[in-house]
Each structure stands twice: as structure tokens, then as C-alpha cells.
Amino acid sequence: MWPASQYSHSNMQPHQHKSNEHQNQQNLKTLGMTSAISLAGPKPIDIEKTNELKDALEPFGVFESDQEMHHRMEVLGALHRIVRQWIRDESMRKNMPPNVAETVGGNIYTFGSYRLGVHHRGADIDALCVAPRHIDRSDYFQSFYELLKHHSQVKDLRSVENAFVPVIKMNFDGIEIDLLFARLALKEIPDSFDLRDDMLLKNLDEKSVRSLNGCRVTDEILRLVPNIDNFRLTLRAIKLWAKRHGIYSNTLGYLGGVSWAMLVARTCQLYPNALPATLVHKFFLVFSQWKWPQPVLLKQPDSVNLKFPVWDPRVNVSDRFHLMPIITPAYPQQNSTFNVSLSTRTVIMEEFRVGLAITDEIMLGKCGWERLFEAPNFFSRYKHFIVLLASSATADDQLQWCGLIESRIRHLITNLERNQHITIAHVNPECYNSVPLNTNNGQPLALPPGSVVPSDPAQDSKPNENGALVANYCSMWFIGLVFEKSIVNVDLTFDISSFTESVHYQAKNANMLREAMSIEARHVRRKQLHQYLSPSLLKRERTTSVNKRKHETPAPTAAVKKNKRLSESSTDDVACLSYNEDSNSSNIYEVSIQNGSAPHNAPLADKPAGDKADHASTSSTIACT
């Protein structure tokens, strides 16, 4: 039986911790691609600031209780036993003698934030099922899936077999788990098996290599930091800051968890003896001045030749166009930030600069850590927005539909960036759920994040008088726009239509397009936001805006204007709480979006041309002053 203690962070591969400590003492100067910037140890003020940082993190639920930790360990132990039982049964089904089937093994490995030891309260767990060579991927997505389907503790089970990294998602006894699968070219998988051996990848298919990569990268990051405890607390702070500031999303072109972990790890290498408070400050110092696209690397790339593609701009032309390369330390090395666009890089760099200004003040005792974790007021930054609305008839349809659309939004951002009149297309990573459309005269109205949308399955499947399903669920994303010129006619028809068509094309190919699914894009001015945001959301934005106006030291306006970053030059002259047009502004924009929606089943159904339900957004030209 696999002991639950194997999953405790304090018991993770003890030999690794010992070797790590030895390496820390002997080779502090050699961790990373360069020598350390400073080997200075902590001063009393650094200890004080680190304790204050811990206290500031507590209210945000970044630390789980001992009870929650033990529950996770029990869940992983139970899942491990299920995997072992399944591999044994599947082996015997394939005519393997029972005594041999008992010894072939099979393991569950964790990776991501849980393996790093920085998961927050209620977070999901990324895990990997490793099986011997006679267990196929098809077995995993068929017989293992069926086994889970009938397990009493498993709920919300779904498989994504055709994904870039195939996965089974589930809720196991209250814990969300994403479980990947890798089949190794070995007869058996012993308990104490180290996945860091590059030769394990020999003769594996690319999907297995990609599945293994999460564990291999996570373990390599932990091996390459000089002090794991300092790394963990620093990473908790940076992850919270990134989420609060809307720049934590690999899918939307910002940085995901592994990218933030590597940036923090690099900071730890450069300041190996520093405490977390100092490391957070140095993090902003280093990366606010980083000369992108110079890559961030934690070590010299491995010279392994197993014919898998690796990130190398000298060889691969496409790699030369990556804007913020952060390279994974395990073979095959990949750029974890290939989704980053010009706009998202601009937003991230601006947040780095603001973070540096705030941590400067924190270290001088002028403000507390709470200031770093204040959420910025996105909606007061811009005068113009594109609102993407995704609608469908049922809760299950909406979950799938939103997932597909969100995976494509970064392509819309790239399209908008190509428009010569658009300087910034800043997507807010928050997906806002609307009140049910049938409770608000068919109009979407965003609820605060985390709100539960009431659902009635009987009402969901109820058709209208024409016998068609009606979209009752709606979600929305907001994209803030900055235009380059003061007087311009901007036509976004092609940008929007190409995006909506690509979403429908992908949905149709994946056989997931359902009746009443639709996607629509609308141009909205700041003064119209109240039509889409609930009063509680607007109130929160106003409160945040007032607080930041009172306390925040403004970023250098020259740098912002020079690079046309984040807000139009006249924004600072406008009261952020006002949703009326700026009467003093001379900027005039005509934004034209024709047929900015993609109605449900547009490519499949034959609807009357004048059906208003099918063409929710027709040709529109909006003058914005």
C-alpha cells in the first residue's frame, strides 16, 4: 500500500532535500546561468519584513490547514491504490499471470503548484499516472475512465482525450484533480522511481513526453533553487500578486504557474541567501529591467539528442518571434510563454514597474505589503472596450463553450494588435458570469467573481414557442482598447469575424457545437459599462479607484506616454469614477463592428435571414467622444 506520507511536502524525496542542501552550501555561485548578484545574508529588518509578508498573505487563503493537507494526502493515496488495482486488473485481462501482474507497479506523481508546495486553500491538484509499457493510452481513457465513473467518491468526471496534453478531470472526495497519463517503455514501474532520467523518454510518443514534462520541470526547478523554503514563500507572494493584478493566465497570453515559478527561481539563484521579503523586492528589480526577448534560463540546456523538438532560436525560425521566452529546465526544453503577445507583454512589464515602485516603499517602511496585493481598477483605465459574450442553453454547454472561447481569445488579441490604429488590446482574464438571461429581459449582467449562477435543468431544456432552445447562460470577457491617433475611423469587422468564425470552426470539428450556442462581440464605451456590470462590481471598482488615487504613487507618465502603455494620455485628466464622456477630450473614434456575433449553429442551421435571435449584433457604427 502506498503510504499517504509520501505526498507530504515535508517528506517529498528526502534524498533530494539532502543533496539540495549540500549543493546549496558548496555551489551557491554556480546555480543558474550566471554567478549570483549578491551573496549577502539577511539583516534584522529583512526578517521583520518577511514576517510582515507572511501576515499579509494569511487573509488571502494561500496557506491551507493541517486538516486540509492531510485530506489531500488521503485522496492521493486512495487514487494511487485505484491506479494500482486498475493496472493489475488490466494486466491480467491481457493474459499476464497474476503473480507477475502484482509486481508491474504503476505510480501517481504530482506536479505543478502542489508539488512545488505553493498551492492555496481549495486549489486543484495536477497529477500524472505512470504505467508500464503494456498499458495503452486507450486503456486509460476507456477502462480506467469507466472505473472512475462508478467510484462513489468521484464526481464531475470528464475526459479530454484529444487535447494537446490529454487529461482526465475529476472531483475526488471534494478535491479537483487533473490526471495525465504516461506510458513508459518499461516492464514495471517501481515505487521509488525517479522521472528525471532523460533516457526514460527514449522511444516514447510525444503525448507521453508532454505529460511527463510537468513532473520533470517541477522537480528540476526545486533542484535548482538554493533554499526551497524561501523560494516557496516568495512564489506564494508573487502568484497572489499576479492573480490580483490580472496577469496570471497562460491561456490568455499572460504567464502561467510554471512561468512565475521559473522567474522566482531565477531571482533566488541571483540572491541565494536573501529572505522572501528581499526576494520579492529583487524580483521586481530584476524583471522590470529585463531585456526581452533575452531568455530566462535556470541552467545550461541539456545536450540530449532524442530527436524531440526543443526551443532554439538558432535553429527554429518560429522561436525567434517569441516575445518573453522563459525556458523550462528539463529536456526537451520549451518556452513556457509562447502565448505572450505585444499587448500582454506591455501589461506585464507595466505591472513589474509598478510592483517595483510599491516594494521600494515597503522596504523603506512607507507602506505595508497589503498595498502590493490591492487589485487594480481595470475598468477605469480605458474609454473603449470590446465585450465578448458567450451564450448557451445549459450549464454543461456553457462550461465547454467558455473553455473553447477562452482558449482562442489570445488569437483575437493578436488580430487586434495588427490593426494599425490600436496600440493596446488589454484582455481582463476574469470571465464574468451573467445573471440568467431570462431574469433580466434577455440582457447580460455580470456578477461578481465567484458568484453562483442559479440553474434550473428543467427550465434550461424548455424550448421557445418556435420549438428552439433559448440561450439562458451567458459569460463575458472585457478587452480594453487604446487607439493610437486622436481622430480615426476604426473598422474591426474583419478582426472580430475571423475570430468568431475560427471559434465556430473549431467547435464544429470537435463536435461540441450545440443549439443556442452563440458568441458575440460588442463595442462598449466606459459610460455604458453599467449595462454589463452589476452595481456591486461597479461599486468595488469605484472603491478601488478611490483608494489607489489616495495612496498610490503614480508611475512615471513620460514612460507611459512614450510607450503608449495601459491608458490613453488623457485618462489621468478624467475622474476615474465618472462614466460620462470626458467633455474636455478632443479624441473622436468611430468603431465599426459589422456582424460582430456568431449565432448558434450558424454554419449548420438554415435560419431565416431576418431572424433577430440569430443575428443579435448587426451592422453598427458607434461614435465615441
Model-found features: residue ranges?
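Extended intrinsically disordered, low-complexity regulatory segments in eukaryotic proteins
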Residues: 461-468, 514-522, 526-625
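Pol beta-like nucleotidyltransferase catalytic core
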Residues: 31-42, 46, 51-52, 236, ...
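Metal-dependent nucleotidyltransferase catalytic core
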Residues: 73-97, 102-108, 117, 129-180, ...
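Conserved NTP/Mg2+-binding pocket subregion across the NTase superfamily
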Residues: 155-157, 164-249, 258, 317, ...
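Ordered, helix-dominated protein-protein interaction surfaces in large eukaryotic regulatory proteins
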Residues: 55-59, 78-81, 85, 110-113, ...
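Glycine-rich, often proline-containing surface loops adjacent to acidic residues and nearby aromatics
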Residues: 123-128, 214-218, 383-387
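N-terminal regions immediately upstream of nucleotidyltransferase
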Residues: 1-122, 134-143, 150, 157-169, ...
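Acidic, Ser/Thr-rich intrinsically disordered and amphipathic helical segments
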Residues: 48, 52, 71-74, 78-82, ...
